[in-house]
Amino acid sequence: YTFDDGLQEHYTLLFPKLEKYGFKGTFWIWGKCIENESAMQGKPRMSWAQIKEMSDKGQEISSHSWSHTNLKRVSLEEVKMEVEKNDSILYEKTGKIPRTFCYPFNAVNSDILKITSKNRVGTRTEQYPIGGDKSKSTPESLDKWVESLVNSGRWGVAMIHGISQGYDAFLNPEILWEHFSKV
């Protein structure tokens, strides 16, 4: 499971559930919103201390660029700066080098992929969004998704933003908790 944007409720609501079920997730952090309250867009974010605690307990903390910009709309030099600046602060704050990358707005092309893939084990190029969209947020639809993965022998990467608030939040967070209990 992947969780985008470093929302405060990822620490307060989600992290305890992951611990309860023994799950590890990937948390895509864009450093500017953690460093600068004006970049938070009205959505409370985790602190660096909370991010470090999660990292120390085995959650993957990785890069979502410095400022969450659409990388297709900036120069390749700016892409490089977005990646390097965020990687540097994530390393400084967690003591771990980010090993994966998530594209803001899923905006990627072959030139961007070359830059973001350097020194990484992977980048998120495919995902299954779950959250606010009713068609993908019911217990039945989540069960069906997992069943299709098991039957086909494929991997699945769940992309989650808000839990109870914010972008694509669940209509009821219990849907996610119930899903975790089944998986």
Annotate the PLM regions:
Residues 133-141:
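Substrate-binding/catalytic cleft of secreted carbohydrate-active enzymes
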Residues 76-81, 139, 170-177:
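Non-membrane alpha-helical structural segments and their capping/turn regions in soluble enzymes
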Residues 13-17, 111-115, 145, 179:
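A short acidic, amphipathic alpha-helical/loop segment
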Residues 140-149:
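A short, acidic, amphipathic alpha-helical segment used as a generic capping/interface helix at domain edges
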Residues 9, 19-113, 118-122, 126-131, ...:
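Metal-dependent polysaccharide deacetylase catalytic core of the NodB/CE4 family, i.e.
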Residues 131-133, 170-171:
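Gly/Pro-rich active-site loop or hairpin
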Residues 21, 30, 172, 176-181:
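N-terminal structural segment of carbohydrate-active enzymes
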Residues 1-9:
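Boundary/entry segment of secreted carbohydrate-active catalytic domains
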